[in-house]
Design a protein with these regions (language model features):
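Helical scaffold of the NTase/Pol beta-like nucleotidyltransferase catalytic core
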Residues: 1-37
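Active-site nucleotide-donor binding segment shared across nucleotidyl transfer reactions
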Residues: 23-65
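Short, charged/polar surface micro-motifs in flexible loops or helix N-caps
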Residues: 57-62, 100, 111-114
Length: 183
C-alpha cells in the first residue's frame, strides 16, 4: 500500500475511534437524517477534519444550541464556532483528542439538500477504484488544495473525467475556470 493510502487509512481509523467512542452518530441522528462527509465516508482523508450533514427542516436556534451543548459535553473543545446562514446552521468544533488536533464541521441543512448529497455520495462511491483513490489522495495533498480547488473539483476530475496525473489535472482546472468565467 502506498504512503498516501496508508496515511489515509490511519486517519480513518482514528476518526472511527473518535466517532464511536463519543457516540457522535447517535447524537447527530437525534437532530435529523445524517450523512458523514465524503472524505470520511469514501476513505480519502488527508487531515483530521470530519464533516457531517444533518437534514432537518424544522431546526431552530434553541435546538442547534442544545446540539452545541451536547458536543461540548462530549468533546471538551478548546474552541467552537457557530454560524447561522441562510438555510444552514453550522458548528465547527476544535479539540485535542489523543494528542492530535481535530475539527468537526457539522452543518444542519434542509432535508432535501442532505438527501441530494447522499445520492451524490453514493454515485461517487460507485465510481471508486484503488487507482482512483490514490489519484484523489495525491491531488488532495497538493499545496493548492482548498485554496485554489476543492474536493468537488478533485472528485469530478478523477471520477468523471478520468484525470490521473498532475499536469492533466492542472490543465483540467484551467479549463474549468474558463468555463465558469463564461457562464
Amino acid at each position: 500500500m502506498n504512503e498516501l493510502l496508508s496515511y489515509s487509512s490511519e486517519l480513518k481509523h482514528e476518526a472511527n475511534q473518535l466517532v464511536v467512542s463519543s457516540n457522535l452518530l447517535d447524537l447527530l441522528r437525534e437532530y435529523g437524517c445524517l450523512l458523514s462527509g465524503e472524505s470520511f465516508e469514501l476513505n480519502v482523508m488527508t487531515n483530521r477534519i470530519i464533516n457531517f450533514y444533518v437534514g432537518n427542516d424544522e431546526m431552530d436556534e434553541e435546538s442547534i444550541f442544545h446540539m452545541g451543548y451536547q458536543l461540548t459535553k462530549r468533546f471538551s473543545p478548546y474552541k467552537m464556532i457557530f454560524a447561522n446562514e441562510k438555510d444552514k446552521y453550522q458548528w465547527s468544533v476544535y479539540m485535542i483528542q489523543k494528542g492530535e488536533e481535530w475539527k468537526l464541521d457539522i452543518s444542519v441543512l434542509p432535508e432535501n439538500i442532505v438527501k441530494g448529497k447522499v445520492k451524490k455520495q453514493e454515485l461517487l462511491k460507485s465510481l471508486f477504484t484503488e487507482k482512483k483513490r490514490e489519484c484523489i489522495l495525491f491531488f488532495k495533498q497538493q499545496s493548492g488544495y482548498n485554496r485554489y480547488y476543492t474536493s468537488d473539483h478533485v472528485y469530478k476530475a478523477v471520477l468523471e473525467d478520468d484525470i490521473h496525473d498532475d499536469m492533466s489535472f492542472f490543465m483540467w482546472l484551467q479549463r474549468q475556470k474558463k468555463v465558469n468565467q463564461q457562464t
